[in-house]
Regions:
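Generic structural signal for residues in well-ordered beta-strands
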Residues: 175, 248, 279, 415-419
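Glycine-/small-residue-rich active-site loops that bind phosphorylated ligands and cofactors
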Residues: 183, 232, 281, 393-394
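Conserved AMP-binding/adenylate-forming
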Residues: 232-324
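Detector for glycine-centered tight turns/loop "hinges" at secondary-structure junctions
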Residues: 117, 286-287, 350, 432
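Conserved hydrophobic helix-helix packing surfaces used for dimerization/oligomerization
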Residues: 147-149, 297, 384
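AMP-binding/adenylate-forming catalytic core of the ANL superfamily
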Residues: 199, 303-413
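Active-site phosphate/ATP/adenylate-binding loop shared across adenylate-forming ligases
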Residues: 1-10, 69-224, 228-244, 257, ...
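Nucleotide 5′-phosphate-binding alpha/beta core
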Residues: 1-111, 117-131, 137-144, 219-220, ...
């Protein structure tokens, strides 16, 4: 099988039942294709007792999960195109090609930061990219091809945000990429000159720009703001909406799937694009969590066949939303953190355990009015410095919440901590994002 069957598109106004039926048919298409074209998946499934005739009926939960470490270790056997070889892709990335460049003139290449221990490389073919382009219809924005769009994030490498903007929005509008690693005052001057009509970037960096706008240092008037890349708290939304009274869209995008979920302007929940992927939110035992519960996201990308991701364990923890009425798509209410943002703490018995990032957000008692952003700096398992951006005098509330976490963990007597307010939390020099947990150099 050299060519897959056609990807089934979701018609406008489709109901939930129809969306899920299309999802299942596209899953069958994907499984049939990888059985014939991906040596890794064919062997992987056969080793778990599956054969080709099972692919027409097997449920998603009957398939074994995969991970970044597994797929990167077997990359050359996972991909379905012989032009894709990990060593060649790594060498191409190191050449620092322009964002809109294509590998072998046909593949769009992204990579992760490697902060979790191994850099992930993800490849999309033109068909997958066209599918994303067709879905990237942002509301309240029809200013034409000469409209200025600015992406504000990490632009020094092939991270998903910059590449997606260059390859999708760059084909429609006058796009500029602005590095979040440059001084904010310099970026504000450039933005004042650019006067963008659409502003896109990490939630943390867009909030910083909103603060500059509220003080008068930034004078731009976008018609729409799109945030992505890191969690967007209620306080951050309030500040952005105070700076610009325009629609604010929260896009959940990752290297593994460029459009996982999106929130319409004014909506608290994000709609999962169930026709493009299967998003399972699972507990530690691998069971689907109930509505309003938090679990780890396991993703099956249905639209990208070049590097198939099937039951792929993401690093993200999300809170599952409810299905009120009969919406076509499922929802998530919060992106709580990432697996590699665990905070190590010393327990009373001398052992070292981790506090899950879920508990370092609003899920763990940090949903505090006026609190914009937190960062937990681990100096040692016995010492944590908590930095926060927000209004004055929140130290006691933050300390109370963290003390309760330590007590529940059995570390209240063995871990000391400080809480300090800062004007802004500095982004990571590699990713441009503000990490929830930062490991300070051990002294």
């Amino acid at each position: 099988m050299s060519q897959p069957g056609p990807f089934e598109e979701t018609p406008p106004h489709a109901g939930r039942h129809e969306v899920l039926a299309i999802q299942q048919r596209n899953l069958r298409r994907l499984l049939t294709y990888v059985w014939h074209c991906s040596p890794f998946y064919r062997r992987f499934y056969a080793d778990h007792g599956l054969c080709e005739r099972d692919l027409g009926e097997v449920g998603i939960r009957d398939l074994p999960p995969t991970s970044k470490d597994v797929l990167m270790a077997h990359f050359d056997c996972v991909v379905t195109d012989e032009q894709l070889r990990l060593a060649d892709l790594q060498a191409w990335i190191e050449r620092d090609t322009p964002p809109a460049s294509l590998f072998a003139r046909k593949f769009i290449v992204l990579h992760t930061s490697g902060s979790s221990g191994r850099m992930g490389i993800f490849v999309y073919d033109r068909a997958a990219w066209r599918r994303i382009l067709a879905r990237m219809n942002l509301p309240h924005f029809d200013d034409g091809a000469d409209a200025r769009v600015v992406y504000y994030g990490a632009v020094h490498s092939r991270f998903a945000g910059a590449i997606m903007c260059a390859c999708v929005l760059g084909t429609r509008y006058a796009l500029s990429l602005l590095s979040v690693l440059e001084p904010h005052t310099r970026n504000a001057r450039q933005l004042n000159e650019m006067r963008p009509k659409m502003l896109i970037g990490y939630a943390s960096s867009i909030t910083t720009l909103a603060d500059l706008a509220l003080t008068g240092a930034l004078d731009i008037h976008p018609k729409i703001v799109v945030v992505s890349g890191d969690p967007f708290t209620a306080e951050m939304r309030r500040r952005v909406e105070s700076a610009w009274d325009v629609p604010v869209v929260n896009l959940y995008s990752a290297s593994e799937s460029l459009m996982i979920a999106i929130s319409p302007p004014g909506a608290a929940e994000m709609c999962v694009l169930d026709d493009l992927q299967i998003a399972e939110v699972l507990d530690e035992a691998g069971r689907e969590v109930a509505a309003h519960e938090t679990g780890r996201l396991t993703l099956t990308n249905l639209y990208n066949l070049s590097l198939p991701l099937i039951r792929y364990k993401m690093d993200d923890f999300v809170t599952k939303g409810a299905l009120a009425g009969s919406p076509p798509f499922g929802t998530i209410t919060d992106i709580c953190g990432r697996e590699h943002e665990m905070l190590p703490v010393r327990l009373a018995d001398g052992a070292v355990d981790d506090i899950n990032p879920i508990m370092l957000t609003g899920c763990g008692g940090f949903d505090i009015p006026g609190l914009e952003r937190l960062q937990f700096v681990s100096r040692a398992p016995e010492r944590v410095d908590i930095l926060y951006a927000g209004i004055d005098s929140l130290e006691a509330r933050i300390g109370e919440s963290f003390r309760a976490l330590l007590a529940a963990k059995g570390a209240a007597q063995t871990v000391t901590f400080t809480v300090s307010r800062v004007d802004a939390l500095a982004p990571d020099s590699g990713t441009g994002k503000v990490p929830l947990v930062r490991m300070a150099p051990r002294v």
